[in-house]
Curated annotation (Swiss-Prot):
It comes from Chelativorans sp. (strain BNC1). It catalyses: (4aS,6R)-4a-hydroxy-L-erythro-5,6,7,8-tetrahydrobiopterin = (6R)-L-erythro-6,7-dihydrobiopterin + H2O. It is an enzyme of class 4 (lyase). CDD domains: PCD_DCoH_subfamily_b. One of its GO terms (biological process) is tetrahydrobiopterin biosynthetic process. This is Putative pterin-4-alpha-carbinolamine dehydratase. Pfam families: Pterin_4a.
């Protein structure tokens, strides 16, 4: 999987394919808040996302408070966003929709 930093146009294209994700301040990360009906659903989402992240060897910055999960994705080694961030974001969206 490519860990090459994406340019502005590639980032805009990637965001156009992702519901509810936003470019974080500074433009080097994307962020989304997921809200579930309860803690069990939030934790189940995090478990599925963690397994996908491990498989991709790409790990999110996230916090969980009760039924809310805030996620920030960036590729620290590349100093910005890469294809991995968008791939993991798409997987997270799919898991949240289940």
């Amino acid at each position: 999987m490519a860990r090459q930093k994406l340019d502005r146009k590639e980032i805009e294209n990637g965001l156009s394919e992702l519901d509810e994700w936003e470019l974080a301040e500074g433009g080097n990360a994307i962020h989304r808040r997921f809200v579930f009906s309860n803690f069990n659903e939030a934790f189940g989402f995090m478990t599925r996302a963690a397994l996908a992240a491990e498989k991709l060897d790409h790990h999110p910055e996230w916090t969980n408070v009760y039924k809310t999960v805030d996620v920030t994705l960036t590729t620290h080694a590349s100093g910005g966003l890469t294809e991995l961030d968008f791939k993991l974001a798409k997987k997270m969206n799919a898991y949240a929709a289940k």
